[in-house]
Amino acid sequence: MDHVNRQFHAPAPDRLWLSDFTYVATWAGFVYVAFVIDAYARRIVGWRASRTAHASFVLDALEQALHERRPLHRGGLIHHSDRGAQYVSIKYTERLAQAGVEPSVGSVGDSYDNALAETINGLYKAEVIHRRGPWRSFEAVEFATLEWVDWFNNRRLLEPIGNVPPAEAEAAYYASRQPSAMAA
């Protein structure tokens, strides 16, 4: 069921995560790269590169996001993806349930149903893959992805969130929720 209905906004961090993966051609074969994105500030909260497109690699990206973020409001986080076999697999959906995360999937063959995740994939391809290729190996893609995710989260300015990096937008959200030291 699609709980997002193309509304890729969240009132706070860890309320809506979006997932998708893309592939990169290398001289040694394809590399598959999965991302988990927090919709609030478009921050990449989990990612994984793999030599195969099995469900385990998207599950690894989800595990990274769950470990890093440790979402506390059980029942308040929606995880949205396309209907790819990896995301509707028993292992993946069971892990979402175990973590108290509500699954949401778009319709078959409609990239607009996961447009924000597709946009992040497009930025990744434009800003690192096409710019720095051709790629020789899995390791080269994995390392470049690690560098790009750090740059994207901490230094890339995003117009939809106020021309600040995702980490800064999130920090501003949490700072606005802290009781003012001056009020005491």
Identify the role of each PLM range.
Residues 1-184:
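Charged DNA-binding/catalytic regions of mobile-element recombinases
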